[in-house]
């Protein structure tokens, strides 16, 4: 229902779709970046808490830790305990984080839609914050589909494919394809589950393409934007 609500809101009011200006809800770029970073980690923390609660409700152990996705610092829930469950019981704990994100996005969109329709009149600062949350949630949900990283959608696809160690087997496969594999790496790949090896044969190309895309994004956008914000801060 939340997903349908989001789609209907965007269709009814295309202006609700986040623009680049939503990344600056406060008076200055530096303060806006700090606010976005804090907001991101707060929402991601709640996202991971949902994973943890769902895993505990399913009767398996789970833990939340700080990790990274490429050059991004993230929260991560260890859900390896789900492998002890039947496959059909693993999906809900894997998908509940995106469910939380969608519910938050739907609530924010309804508030913004109500404001545009004149049902309430938020202060400009609050309207900017709601637009920024929309941006964070759209980006957050979109990034879950980056299956070349260990995202929720990656975990769902790996589960649906019957894999248990796809990530490590993919890295071993890439080493072998590039000629960087040691005898130990080749032996580990041969000992891996046949299903993981079969899926890794095509997933490795998706992973490699994703890494190239991520490297381009870092060089073209992430690093220059970070340098500009730091330079602006130091020059004040």
Task: Enumerate the language-model features and the residues they cover.
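Topogenic membrane-insertion module of multi-pass membrane proteins
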Residues: 1-42
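C-terminal membrane-associated helical module and adjoining short loops/tails
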Residues: 146-236
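Select subsegments of transmembrane alpha-helices in polytopic membrane proteins
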Residues: 1-4, 92-103, 203-214
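Membrane-interfacial helical/loop segments at transmembrane boundaries in membrane proteins
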Residues: 16-23, 120, 227-236
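Membrane-embedded catalytic scaffold of the fatty acid hydroxylase/desaturase
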Residues: 31-188
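Hydrophobic core of alpha-helical transmembrane segments in multi-pass integral membrane proteins
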Residues: 2-11, 110, 210-219
């Amino acid at each position: 229902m939340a997903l349908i609500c989001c789609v209907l809101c965007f269709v009814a009011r295309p202006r609700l779709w986040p623009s680049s200006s939503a990344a600056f809800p406060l008076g200055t770029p530096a303060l806006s970046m700090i606010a976005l970073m804090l907001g991101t980690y707060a929402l991601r923390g709640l996202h991971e808490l949902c994973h943890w609660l769902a895993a505990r409700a399913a009767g398996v152990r789970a833990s939340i830790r700080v990790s990274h996705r490429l050059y991004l610092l993230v929260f991560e829930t260890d859900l390896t305990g789900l492998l002890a469950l039947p496959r059909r019981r693993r999906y809900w704990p894997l998908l509940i984080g995106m469910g939380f994100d969608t519910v938050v996005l739907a609530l924010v969109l309804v508030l913004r839609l109500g404001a545009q329709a004149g049902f309430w009149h938020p202060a400009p600062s609050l309207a900017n914050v709601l637009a920024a949350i929309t941006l964070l949630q759209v980006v957050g949900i979109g990034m879950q589909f980056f299956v070349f990283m260990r995202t929720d959608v990656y975990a769902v696809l790996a589960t649906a494919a019957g894999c248990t160690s796809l990530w490590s087997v993919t890295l071993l496969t890439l080493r072998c394809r590039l000629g960087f594999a040691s005898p130990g790496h080749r032996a580990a790949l041969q000992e891996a589950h046949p299903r993981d090896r079969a899926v890794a044969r095509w997933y490795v190309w998706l992973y490699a393409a994703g890494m190239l895309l991520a490297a381009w994004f870092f060089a073209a956008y992430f690093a220059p934007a970070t340098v500009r914000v730091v330079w602006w801060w130091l020059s004040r």
